[in-house]
């Protein structure tokens, strides 16, 4: 593994760790390689899960393009590296009971106004898909440099005090941002340029 650095390893507020940050897991060359791999596969319009479990397109809630990637021989090195980081984050900050993960999402916010409104990654809708209801620890990885876009901030609401002024995690290429899947978060509207990221979800038994 490349040398690791930690920025604010655990952001704590009222004994809660809403996010955990790691830097330098992937080199710049590796990030280029990941981006090229994802771009080659293409993208499709992102959708959302409604309260009744229906999966629909809703530009007011989510306007971006995505593609899901399952683990295979070609991308195994990505999963191996991310697994090590998940283990560190979970050990240091959360101690969740996790079963692992087998896919990731490539996300592209490629025009003005592209966004993903406030949401949780774990679904409480009436669905049987364990990939939606079993999410416990989320990870967002910034693929491109912050100079390539404006807006698109990754923001979180953790209590009543942060509703009006959400916590904004600073952009940095390659930054890993871990957070519990029940944390309310969003990608603010992109003002210019293109924002690219990977998203992983580690699954496990339901929160008790």
Please annotate each region the language model reported.
Residues 1-176, 182-208:
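Fe(II)/2-oxoglutarate oxygenase catalytic core
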């Amino acid at each position: 593994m490349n040398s690791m650095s930690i920025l604010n390893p655990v952001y704590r507020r009222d004994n809660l760790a809403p996010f955990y940050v790691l830097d330098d897991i992937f080199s710049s060359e590796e990030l280029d390689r990941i981006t090229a791999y994802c771009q080659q596969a293409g993208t499709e319009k992102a959708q959302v899960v409604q309260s009744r479990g229906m999966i629909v397109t809703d530009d007011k809630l989510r306007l971006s393009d995505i593609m899901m990637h399952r683990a295979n021989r070609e991308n195994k090195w990505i999963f191996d590296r991310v697994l090590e980081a998940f283990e560190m984050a979970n050990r240091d900050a959360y101690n969740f009971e996790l079963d692992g993960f087998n896919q990731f999402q490539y996300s592209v916010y490629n025009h003005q106004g592209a966004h993903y409104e406030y949401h949780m990654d774990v679904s409480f809708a009436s669905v049987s898909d364990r990939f939606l209801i079993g999410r416990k620890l989320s990870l967002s990885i910034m693929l491109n440099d912050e100079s390539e876009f404006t807006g698109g901030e990754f923001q979180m609401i953790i209590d009543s005090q942060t509703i009006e002024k959400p916590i904004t995690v600073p952009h940095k290429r390659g930054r890993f941002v871990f957070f519990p899947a029940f944390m309310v978060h969003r990608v603010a509207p992109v003002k210019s340029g293109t924002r690219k990221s990977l998203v992983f979800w580690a699954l496990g038994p339901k929160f008790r």
